[in-house]
């Protein structure tokens, strides 16, 4: 239908120079634009280009209502510049966004990386950001960390934006866990979505609960809902028969999602979602470009900027992650190695790679664990690994593993040795299913050392 309407509109223009197909003209018109992203993790190379992109989008769409929605995990404790500066760049980014458009942030598990949760919310509000979070309370006061929802004016239309976050305390900074009271997101949604999303013409959900929880929440939302997910560091879009548009925007601000509000021939609203790459090398906002350079100069040490390797070409994060998994397999004497995708942040640049760039790619360190598994089960584990943006929604269960080493030709009854990180071993059911595997810590192999050793032997 939409292709026909577009053809009708263009044909009318060719014949008369003006539209004689009002339904087609209405269907082509963008009623509002939303720039949506999550899991930013203090990706400072992308900060200035993001604000420049907002300026470009607004200039290219004059008069079109525009807003920015951020779906949690904007901060990154592992970024030494962010930690030492107490996120001054992140807060400047939010101030710049809020100055340009209404900006709403749904809390994730990394917002308390530098401050206690209440202080983090106050810092965000102070720079003009509207903060929401439905299922999180301050255990000391019993009060919500933020309202569950907010209204967003989009020209003549009003959207209701509802926020929900993960209840996995282990993903929060250790120091803030005792003060958090987190309701199960699915239970909370069942109790609160009906009232919050009732009688709203434009329902929007920002979920930082992950795909596993989202799968149970998606049937609870009205037809036509725009449902943004985050937490799993994945990127895809999916449209349900009900018109619900579900998507994740990736991580490290490598992409953003652009949601366009349109009308169908009957006058009902629907959303189109386009995922757009954000080029870190593109010209950025001058003020933020200068700020990033200045703050880095103030807080980086010679150890941070030491060169730890060199690459003939840039490596996207998936390629860098598979190289790391292959390094672990070799170091641990395993047939196949699996590393959870959220272990990795951004990719690696061409040329000299510094310690801080390496740490931004391989976010965590720790011991490697090994286990044995039969070939039939290993075949299933490999099939669930290395998911890209084109993987069908039916295969998505949340976080996944990057796998390397032997990836095929498994004999069903043969026993194979596999390796993973300490995080994978501790969360074996999540990554490797049931029955739980019996993991043993390798006596010497550590993740980052294994990757650096492989790097020095053969450039990836």
Ranges and model annotations:
Residues 15, 19-22, 228:
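Intrinsic low-complexity/disordered segments
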Residues 1-6:
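Positively charged n-region of N-terminal signal peptides that target proteins for export
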Residues 24-283, 287, 319-327, 387, ...:
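Acidic, metal/ion-coordinating pockets
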Residues 17, 164, 383:
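Surface loops and adjacent helix of pleckstrin homology
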Residues 10, 21-24:
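Cleavable N-terminal signal peptides
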Residues 7-17:
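Bacterial N-terminal signal peptides
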Residues 33, 37, 42, 235, ...:
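Catalytic centers of hydrolytic enzymes
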């Amino acid at each position: 239908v939409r292709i026909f309407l577009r053809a009708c509109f263009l044909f009318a223009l060719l014949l008369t120079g003006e539209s004689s197909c009002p339904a087609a003209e209405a269907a082509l018109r963008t009623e509002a634009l939303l720039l949506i992203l999550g899991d930013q993790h203090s990706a400072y190379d992308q900060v200035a280009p993001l604000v420049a992109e907002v300026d470009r989008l607004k200039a290219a769409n004059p008069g079109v209502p525009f807003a920015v929605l951020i779906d949690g995990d904007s901060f990154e404790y592992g970024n030494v510049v962010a930690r030492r500066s107490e996120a001054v760049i992140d807060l400047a980014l939010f101030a710049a966004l809020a100055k340009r458009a209404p900006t709403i942030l749904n809390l994730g598990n990394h917002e308390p990386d530098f401050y206690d949760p209440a202080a983090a919310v106050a810092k965000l509000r102070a720079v003009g950001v509207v903060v929401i979070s439905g299922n999180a309370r301050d255990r000391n006061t019993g009060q919500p960390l933020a309202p569950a929802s907010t209204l967003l004016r989009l020209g003549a239309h009003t959207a209701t934006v509802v926020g929900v976050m993960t209840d996995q305390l282990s993903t929060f900074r250790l120091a803030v866990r005792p003060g958090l009271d987190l309701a199960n997101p699915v239970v909370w949604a069942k109790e609160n979505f009906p009232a919050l999303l009732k009688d709203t013409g434009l329902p929007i959900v920002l979920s930082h609960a992950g795909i596993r929880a989202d799968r149970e929440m998606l049937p609870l939302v009205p037809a036509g809902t725009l449902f943004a997910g985050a937490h799993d560091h994945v990127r895809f879009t999916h449209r349900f028969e009900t018109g619900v548009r579900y998507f994740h925007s990736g991580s490290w601000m490598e992409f953003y999602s652009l949601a366009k509000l349109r009308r169908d021939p009957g006058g009902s609203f629907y959303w189109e979602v386009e995922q757009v790459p954000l080029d870190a090398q593109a010209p950025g906002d001058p003020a933020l470009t200068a700020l990033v350079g200045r703050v880095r100069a103030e807080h980086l040490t010679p150890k941070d900027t030491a060169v730890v390797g060199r690459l003939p070409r840039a490596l996207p994060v998936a390629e860098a992650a598979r190289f790391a998994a292959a390094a672990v397999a070799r170091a641990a004497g395993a047939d196949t190695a699996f590393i959870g995708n959220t272990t990795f942040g951004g990719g690696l640049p061409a040329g000299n790679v510094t310690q801080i760039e390496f740490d931004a790619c391989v976010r965590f360190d720790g011991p490697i664990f090994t286990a044995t598994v039969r070939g039939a089960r290993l075949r299933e584990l490999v099939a669930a690994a290395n998911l890209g943006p084109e993987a069908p929604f039916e295969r998505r269960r949340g976080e996944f593993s990057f796998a390397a080493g032997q990836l095929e030709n498994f004999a069903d009854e043969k026993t194979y040795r596999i390796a993973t990180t300490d995080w994978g071993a501790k969360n074996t059911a999540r990554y490797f299913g049931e029955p739980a595997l019996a993991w043993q810590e390798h006596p010497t192999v550590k993740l980052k050392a294994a990757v650096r050793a492989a790097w020095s032997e053969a450039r990836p």
